[in-house]
Regions:
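Short, structured beta/alpha segment
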Residues: 1-87
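Conserved C-terminal structural/oligomerization subdomain of aldehyde/semialdehyde dehydrogenase
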Residues: 25-31, 230, 267, 360-482
Length: 482
């Protein structure tokens, strides 16, 4: 399906176009319409009109049914979504078919279920100065709370997991009764356009969901986040972009929810199951060629097993096949610049560090080698800055306290993994790691009901389950004297 805006219940392709490039072989495969300021404004006004026409007052039953129709619509076009995801990102088809698209379907179904049975507290309060006289009531007041939608929500999603992370925000926003204006990454417009088609066929009122394509600075992203008609902003992407959006949001004191970058550590203790820790670290470093915010970029290994682990990790990295490209030539060049910088800073290259040769059209694509490095100081830029590619730096530690100091010495704090057979150590270490998520003897094992998000420069707020529903709605206290 050709990329198109979806505004007020209609598809449109007006606006200048920019190229859509296949990262696998570098070919131009399509054009994407660039939203003008007017199109963004029309999308926000369409969303506001949908709220005023009654969407914000619909009951949970109607909203849950709409979410389930959307989930069913994605399921019915499953292969089409997989094809679009692979075409935009170049990721392995198996990853799209087993993670991205099923999780997107699951997001809508999960929030349909969560709409029922949310507990709300009620309190009775004594009325000051009350006396028991005829007609004076009970001398008490009943306080209870209800939640209402925020209004028009701007959702800006990234290119690495384009459908999954778009639906991760759209589903709870719609569940809470908001109207949405979404802007996907300019690199990955296809699954977002397909989602708009599914929502259109699901019969939601015109304007409840709107989609605009375009870039960020002085373009659709900036115009949307500065728009006075937007009541909240939810964004996943780079920390620097999050800071820019926060400045835009400050003009109107617009609430924000951010899931930003990470420089995630793995702590591997000598008592860990070596093979399990190795398998898990290969996954956490190199899945989707490291282009997942949760991927590991810093690996700390207890000294007794350090040399063995480094050798095994390097061997596994060299043996990897079937991995995907970087999303763009620009991002490939950024990752390669970090590879060169690491060597300049004194790194030892255990595996990778360059560009692979395939002998086919992929040689024109945006690939880099899975890379394992050692020998850098903790002050090195590659150890401090997010690369967002298939690279990790491995360093030794001697004590539990040193491992924690190394893990926490970062401007980021999204996720961490801990590998140990010692259950007491796991319970002791996990709360001391300064991240929003800690996995013990696993990686990226997710439950949609749990809080998801980071600390420091990795984000503001939490997503998932009731945490998302709380962000996308506001509590109203009602006090009735009885």
């Amino acid at each position: 399906m050709k990329a198109a805006h979806y505004v007020g219940g209609g598809f449109r392709t007006d606006g200048a176009a920019f190229a859509l490039v296949d990262p696998v072989d570098g070919r131009r495969v399509g054009d994407v319409p660039e939203a003008t300021r007017q199109i963004v404004d029309e999308a926000v006004r369409a969303a506001r009109a949908a709220l005023e026409d009654g969407w914000g007052r619909t009951g949970a039953t109607e909203r849950a049914a709409a979410l389930r129709r959307i989930a069913d619509g994605i399921q019915a076009r499953f292969d089409e979504f997989v094809d679009a995801e692979v075409a935009d990102t170049g990721k392995p088809r198996e990853l799209a078919a087993t993670v991205d698209i099923p999780r997107a379907i699951g997001n809508f179904r999960a929030y349909a279920d969560l709409l029922y049975g949310r507990p709300e507290r009620a309190y009775t309060t004594d009325v000051p100065g009350w006396s028991a006289t005829p007609g004076a009531g009970t001398g008490q007041a009943l306080n209870y709370s209800v939640r209402r939608p925020l209004g028009v929500v701007a959702i800006i999603s990234p290119w690495n997991l384009p459908l999954l992370l778009l639906t991760w925000k759209v589903a709870p926003a719609l569940a809470a009764g908001n109207a949405v204006v979404a802007k996907p990454s300019e690199e990955t417009p296809s699954t977002a356009t397909l989602l708009a088609s599914v929502i259109d066929q699901a019969g939601l009122p015109d304007g409840v969901f709107n989609l605009v394509h375009g870039h960020g600075t002085d373009a659709a992203g900036e115009w949307l986040t500065r728009h006075p008609g937007v009541d909240a902003i939810a964004f996943t992407g780079e920390s620097a972009t999050g800071a820019a959006i926060m400045r835009n949001a400050a003009d109107h004191i617009t609430p924000v929810s951010f899931e930003l970058g990470g420089k995630n550590p793995a702590l591997i203790f000598a008592d860990a199951d070596f093979d399990a820790a190795l398998d898990g670290t290969v996954r956490s470093c190199f899945t989707h060629s490291g282009q997942i915010c949760l991927c590991t970029e810093r690996v700390y290994v207890e000294r007794p097993v350090f040399e063995e682990f480094v050798a095994a990790l390097g061997e596994r990295a060299r043996a990897l096949e079937g991995y995907g490209p970087m999303i763009s030539a620009q991002h490939r060049d950024k990752v390669l610049s970090y590879y060169r910088l690491a060597v300049e800073e004194g790194a030892t290259v255990v595996a990778g560090g360059g560009v692979p040769t395939f002998g086919d059209d992929r040689d024109n694509g945006f690939y880099v080698e899975p890379t394992v490095l050692t020998g850098l100081p903790e002050t090195a830029r590659l150890v401090r800055e997010e690369v967002f590619g298939p690279v990790c730096h491995v360093a030794p530690f001697d004590t539990e306290d040193e491992a924690l100091r190394l893990a926490n010495d970062s401007p980021y704090g999204l996720a961490a993994t801990v590998w140990t057979r010692d259950l007491s150590r796991a319970h002791r270490v996990a709360p001391r790691v300064e991240t929003g998520i800690v996995w013990v003897n696993c990686w990226n094992l997710r439950d949609l009901r749990t809080p998801f998000g980071g600390v420091k420069a990795s984000g503001i707020g939490r997503e998932g389950g009731e945490y998302s529903l709380d962000f996308f709605s506001e509590p109203v206290n009602v006090c009735i004297q009885i």
